[in-house]
From Swiss-Prot:
Binding sites annotated in the UniProt record for NAD(+): 7-12, 33, 96-98, 120-123
Residues binding (S)-2,3,4,5-tetrahydrodipicolinate, per UniProt: 154, 163-164
GO biological process: one example: diaminopimelate biosynthetic process
The keyword NADP appears for this protein: yes
Cellular component, GO annotation: cytosol
Name the record gives this protein: 4-hydroxy-tetrahydrodipicolinate reductase
Catalytic activity annotation: (S)-2,3,4,5-tetrahydrodipicolinate + NAD(+) + H2O = (2S,4S)-4-hydroxy-2,3,4,5-tetrahydrodipicolinate + NADH + H(+); (S)-2,3,4,5-tetrahydrodipicolinate + NADP(+) + H2O = (2S,4S)-4-hydroxy-2,3,4,5-tetrahydrodipicolinate + NADPH + H(+)
EC main group: oxidoreductase
Pathway given in the UniProt record: Amino-acid biosynthesis; L-lysine biosynthesis via DAP pathway; (S)-tetrahydrodipicolinate from L-aspartate: step 4/4
Originating gene: dapB
Family named by the database record: Belongs to the DapB family.
NCBIfam families linked to this entry: dapB
Annotated GO MF terms: 4-hydroxy-tetrahydrodipicolinate reductase; NAD binding; NADP binding; oxidoreductase activity, acting on CH or CH2 groups, NAD or NADP as acceptor
Described purpose of this protein according to its UniProt entry: Catalyzes the conversion of 4-hydroxy-tetrahydrodipicolinate (HTPA) to tetrahydrodipicolinate.
């Protein structure tokens, strides 16, 4: 698999490069960064003390012309710019970027008519297993339980709630026959009155170097159930991304997520 990485100097980008270099069936062929990045022209493996022969570049078209896959954990505007060029070069995309708008997601869907894309708020196998557990729990606990989603991330994360927390909310809402937009409560302050029955609450924590913690609380009378996933490193995201690339090898076009990759789709 000939793979290019976007956001090379970021925490996730470095983890992805290391994972690709240590994977037998993967080859690093490109490393992308923005035009003002001070590391442009440096070897992509320099942070590991390795010479890969792949130089960090801002020339998206040139990089994607040599890549079968682009793994992109950047920001929405960057991802959409990469997508426009990937459509022309036929480079399949694995997108872990969060915070995309409804219009941007619609753009992904449009391009996927011609290009195979995996788009998921979290590439971790464990997180996606958690989504399945939440679907089951929500159906079983649909009456008499209040649902709250608590998420914590590092102080540098720019979007809130996290894409993973929102996906958890969507999974639960769908299991209950609702739309998340109709039942979500993202903030509480002051005299809020009693909790609205059937709502799904969110609480957000930002601080330190927390990789990603998510807990869903089902609170009933006399008992509560908590389903949690805690990430200790970004390695699980990198390995999930490579698994997504392998899945896309057999796809010509279409928009997929990790439920498809893992065979969990109904």
């Amino acid at each position: 698999m000939k793979i290019a990485i976007a956001g090379t100097i970021g925490r996730m980008g470095k983890m992805l490069i290391e994972a690709v270099l240590n994977t037998a069936d993967a080859q690093l062929v490109g490393a992308l960064e923005h035009t003002s990045c001070p590391q442009l022209g440096e070897d992509a493996g320099a942070f590991l003390g390795k010479k890969t022969g792949v130089l960090i570049s801002s020339d998206v078209a040139q990089v994607l012309a040599n890549a079968q896959f682009l793994i992109d954990f950047t920001r929405p505007e960057g991802t959409m710019a990469h997508l426009a060029i990937a459509e022309k070069t036929g480079t399949k995309m694995i997108i872990g970027t969060t915070g995309l708008s409804a219009d941007q997601i619609a753009g992904l869907k449009k391009v996927s008519a011609n290009l195979a894309i995996v788009f998921a708020p979290n590439m971790s196998v464990g997180v996606n297993a958690t989504f399945k557990l939440l679907e089951i729990a929500a159906k079983m606990l649909s009456q008499g339980y209040d649902i709250e989603i608590i998420e914590a991330h590092h102080k540098h994360k720019v979007d809130a709630p996290s894409g993973t927390a929102l996906k958890m909310g969507e999974v639960i809402a769908e299991a209950l026959g609702e739309k998340l937009d109709d039942v979500a409560v993202y903030a509480r302050e002051g005299h809020t009155g009693e909790r609205k029955e059937g709502s799904i609450g969110f609480a957000i924590i930002r601080g330190g170097d927390i990789v990603g913690d998510h807990t869903v609380l089902f609170a009933g009378d006399g008992e509560r159930i908590e389903i949690s996933h805690k990430s200790s490193s970004r390695q699980s995201y990198a390995q999930g991304s490579l698994r997504a690339a392998r899945f896309l090898q057999n796809q010509k076009n279409g928009l997929f997520d990790m439920q498809d990759v893992l065979g969990l789709r109904k």
